Amino acid sequence: YFEWTTYKSKVKPFYDVDVFYESKEEQEKNIEIIKNETRDLLKQIYPETTIAIASSHGEKYKNKSVNKVKTQIKGYAISFHFVMCDYETTVGELKVFNELNGLYDVKFKDTNLKMFDKAVYRDGGNMRFLYSYKPNDDRQKVPDNYKDSYCLTKHVIQSSNATNHFRRALPDTVSPPTTPPVSPKPKD
């Protein structure tokens, strides 16, 4: 199942995070780190939200070009979907909000990896719903929180009376996003 959205669709702010690792150990080590860094940043931007988090981690193949020769690389994906409940906007307004506030340039600490996938903010696109799969992909999207049947509407992107209680406007001003600070390393 998918949700179809256009630039004019009323939605809750949503963010897609996709990180690829060639090593399963690196992927497993970073799942909670990536989830926590992303959630902490989004909570600063949307202070009055509850955040519905879903994931679809697992084995993934990625195309890589070297000297114009495409090869497929086996790796492991970390994939999260964050939905800001109790806020409402349109896909087009959210795309502009994210651009104006530099959210597409935020990187995970100690990495060169960008936090947010901006390709999901398009005029006409399918967003996968819970318990669904992308075509030709074995990774199922499952809720990390709000798993009870009466809470699953928190994961729905489209905003309506049935899916979104307060429907607050996007914040007027946002502090410039920063990569979360690095904790000092203990001295030997």
What is each PLM-predicted segment?
Residues 113-151:
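C-terminal polymerase-core module
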Residues 51-53, 118, 161:
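Residue-level detector of intrinsically disordered, flexible termini
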Residues 149-188:
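Long, charge-rich alpha-helical interaction segments
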Residues 96, 141-143, 170:
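General "foldedness" signal
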Residues 1-114, 127, 133, 178-188:
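Signature for HUH/AEP ssDNA processing cores
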